């Protein structure tokens, strides 16, 4: 069982499954002071500490001064040419790291045909030509970490790639543009996945996630259970350590 809520986890433990606790990094569309959704991207920036706010503004300025603009497309507004360009970028990202892409063009063709409304593409253009892009998934499905409300719209990201190198373009395409889109469209949360404490500088904060597992071999299951107990203590300490590194301003700052 993956990404269950507390009730799911309790039921699984009662059934004899072994719980595992991990950490992901999520952004919430919620002002830390008022609790209301952010009014716009500037409102989000204003909630950050001065150094984090300054760094993001510098990054965005570099991309703008490089002559790069962005185009957003969702669902059927993502054209076949857009999907083809995305796959070129996606494939290049993997090849640059010496790996073959694990999703095929046929997969994305199926997504465009059967689940178009669940995808948003951010295309970076310079001189009228596309040079990079990122792709996020969007869903109102509550099947994600923590058992969130079904009425919430959640974004999941992201795939990315570039055919040209531009300073800070990765941050703009993968974080600033998607977060801006989420704010404008009332998305409750952007789940950035596991790993990467650097995501905290973009206000993606650590969140505990939960899974449960069963192994048929008693000896192997016992060894894994002992490991998970040690790992759980480490995860608790890790979350406590990260808790003091919030990028948001304190109420009195």
Question: Locations of the language-model features?
Answer:
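C-terminal catalytic domain of photolyase/cryptochrome flavoproteins
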Residues: 81, 88, 94-97, 185, ...
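A conserved beta-strand-loop-helix scaffold within acyl/acetyltransferase catalytic domains
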Residues: 1-168, 213-214, 246-253
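Short, hydrophobic/aromatic alpha-helical segments in well-folded domains
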Residues: 89, 107-111, 174-179, 195
């Amino acid at each position: 069982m993956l990404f269950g809520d507390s009730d799911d986890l309790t039921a699984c433990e009662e059934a004899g499954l072994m719980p595992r606790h991990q950490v992901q990094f999520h952004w919430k569309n919620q002002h830390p002071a008022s609790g209301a959704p952010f009014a716009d991207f500037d409102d989000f920036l204003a909630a950050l500490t001065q150094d984090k706010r300054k760094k993001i503004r510098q990054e965005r300025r570099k991309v703008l001064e490089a002559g790069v603009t962005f185009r957003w497309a969702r669902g059927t507004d993502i054209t076949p040419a857009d999907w083809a360009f995305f796959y070129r970028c996606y494939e290049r990202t993997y090849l640059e790291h010496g790996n073959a892409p694990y999703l095929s063009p046929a997969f994305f063709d199926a997504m465009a045909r059967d689940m178009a409304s669940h995808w948003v593409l951010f295309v970076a253009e310079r001189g009228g030509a596309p040079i990079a892009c990122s792709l996020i998934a969007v869903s109102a499905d509550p099947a994600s970490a923590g058992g969130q409300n079904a009425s919430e719209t959640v974004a999941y990201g992201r795939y990315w790639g570039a055919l040209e190198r531009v300073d800070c373009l990765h941050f703009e395409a993968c974080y600033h543009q998607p977060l801006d889109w989420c704010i404008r469209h009332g998305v409750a949360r952007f789940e950035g996945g596991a790993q990467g404490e650097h995501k905290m500088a973009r206000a993606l904060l650590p969140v505990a996630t939960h899974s449960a597992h069963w192994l048929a071999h008693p000896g192997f299951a016992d060894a894994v259970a002992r490991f998970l107990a040690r790992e759980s203590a480490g995860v608790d300490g890790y979350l406590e350590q990260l808790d003091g590194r919030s990028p948001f301003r304190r109420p009195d700052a």
